[in-house]
Amino acid sequence: MALLASAIYSCDDTTGSLGLDMLPGSDNVNVSSTSFDVTTKSILSGPVFAKTDIGYVGKYTDPDFGYFESGFLTQLNCTDSLQFPFGVMAGDTAHLAELVLFYDSYFGDSLNACKMSVYELNKVLDKSHYTNINPDNYYNKSTGLIGSKSYSAVDLSISDSIRNSSNYSKYVRFVLPKSFGDDMIKLNKEHPEYFYNADAFIKNVFKGLYVKSDYGDGTILYINHVNLNIIYNSHYTDSLGNFLKKKDG
């Protein structure tokens, strides 16, 4: 019988209790699982210090957490001692003024129809501010509007080949009134000191932007870069700085 028992153990490949048989019975742990009903609720936190390089804009309704809406205020920097090349410009006016908001990612519906508006600030933002900042204190809704734009997170008017390229960045583009660019060029010519650095530019030329969601529940854009472009016409010049004329034909 002892030989038979030994043969049975040699053929048993069950390892579930391997090692446990060598432990004292007092060291065995009995494991069981169960479930409990719990109740949760969301509590609105107080204001926190706002320090981020991402601007969120859009609206979203969550079945569990409710309605969420976001816009952002931002300032624009200019390069030190920025100056338009008046010597080669074809006139002292702008050809085009545009504002471009770039984003790498978004949350929600990619094709949801949305609209946003951009307002110029009439007050310089504080150096330090918290999330309970009231945008209404920094712009005039009646006179500060500089552009509105309908959009979706994925722009199907742009071909797949371009959107899928490695150097493509998603964006929302506003074409601004030409007078916006004309005024900035004029100010640059008359007061170059206003463009000496970013602080002078913000204080004297352009205090900043408020980007506000108008409609389109279901999409939040994560804006990570804002460009203000003033485009102008200029003359072609040779190596001596002489203007070149277009040849006939």
What are these regions (language model features)?
Residues 1-249:
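Secreted, disulfide-rich extracellular signaling modules
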